């Protein structure tokens, strides 16, 4: 039995009878065997590596790190996500089987961190690419905070109704790389429409003919001087 939420045994009945529903049985089995795909890009991931040791022993939660997204039902993002890495992250998420969950670990993953103020190549929050279930703030978060986030995710899984989670996500998801919320169809290939790609404000409104003509004239002027 799992002591998180909703035990399978109905205590109003006799001890020889177990009363439950298929949905509760599915939730109980999934929350006890979350297999994470580790997507670490920066220093926050070093704190997560501490959980593998004997002091915290995250194996007791049924966590088995996987190297393939097709074998994982949880992706844990830690560190800065750049614009070039955004399609790869979306592709990994789309390759995970349903139901799947996301934990955003660290300030850089949640808001872009200190790189989001004047950087044109940093995604301002991973939730602009994939839906996030648990936010874990910190720079970096402590291993105890990671365990608390996993516990909260297990509680969420135990209360979940499978149909209510699957159908809304298949109809509309947020996929964009220009730091703005955009609801559209699912992207199963990791490719983006050209209209969603980020463009520099200095050249986005200039026609290509005028821009390249101006650039060539500047280059020739520098050569003359």
UniProtKB/Swiss-Prot annotation:
Query: Could you say which enzyme class this protein belongs to?
Result: translocase
Q: How does it sit in the membrane?
A: Peripheral membrane protein
Major subcellular site: plastid
Spell out the InterPro entries in the cross-references: NADH_UbQ_OxRdtase-like_20kDa, NADH_UQ_OxRdtase_20Kd_su
Q: Does the keyword Aminoacyl-tRNA synthetase apply?
A: no
Concerning PROSITE patterns, the annotation shows: COMPLEX1_20K
- E.C. designation(s): 7.1.1.-
Q: Which superkingdom is the protein from?
A: Eukaryota
GO molecular function annotation: 4 iron, 4 sulfur cluster binding; iron ion binding; NADH dehydrogenase (ubiquinone) activity; quinone binding
Query: What function is annotated for this protein?
Result: NDH shuttles electrons from NAD(P)H:plastoquinone, via FMN and iron-sulfur (Fe-S) centers, to quinones in the photosynthetic chain and possibly in a chloroplast respiratory chain. The immediate electron acceptor for the enzyme in this species is believed to be plastoquinone. Couples the redox reaction to proton translocation, and thus conserves the redox energy in a proton gradient.
Which PANTHER family does the annotation name?
NADH DEHYDROGENASE, NADH DEHYDROGENASE [UBIQUINONE] IRON-SULFUR PROTEIN 7, MITOCHONDRIAL
Protein name from the UniProt record: NAD(P)H-quinone oxidoreductase subunit K, chloroplastic
Q: Which organism is it from?
A: Platanus occidentalis
């Amino acid at each position: 039995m799992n002591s998180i939420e909703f035990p399978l045994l109905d205590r109003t009945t006799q001890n020889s009878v177990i009363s439950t529903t298929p949905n509760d049985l599915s939730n109980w089995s999934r929350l006890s065997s979350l297999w994470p795909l580790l997507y670490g890009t920066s220093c926050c991931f070093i704190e997560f590596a501490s959980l593998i040791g004997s002091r915290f022993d995250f194996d007791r939660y049924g966590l088995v790190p996987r190297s393939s997204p097709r074998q994982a039902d949880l992706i844990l993002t830690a560190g800065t996500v750049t614009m070039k890495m955004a399609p790869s992250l979306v592709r990994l998420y789309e390759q995970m089987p349903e139901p799947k969950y996301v934990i955003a670990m660290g300030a850089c993953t949640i808001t872009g961190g200190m790189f989001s103020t004047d950087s044109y190549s940093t995604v301002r929050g991973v939730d602009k690419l994939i839906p996030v279930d648990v936010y874990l703030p910190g720079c970096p978060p402590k291993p105890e905070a990671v365990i608390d986030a996993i516990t909260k995710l297990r509680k969420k899984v135990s209360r979940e109704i499978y149909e209510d989670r699957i159908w809304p996500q298949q109809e509309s998801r947020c996929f964009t790389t220009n730091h703005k919320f955009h609801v559209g169809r699912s992207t199963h290939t990791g490719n983006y429409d050209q209209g969603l790609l980020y463009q520099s404000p200095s050249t986005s409104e200039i026609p290509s003919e005028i821009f390249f003509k101006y650039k060539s004239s500047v280059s020739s002027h520098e050569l003359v001087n």
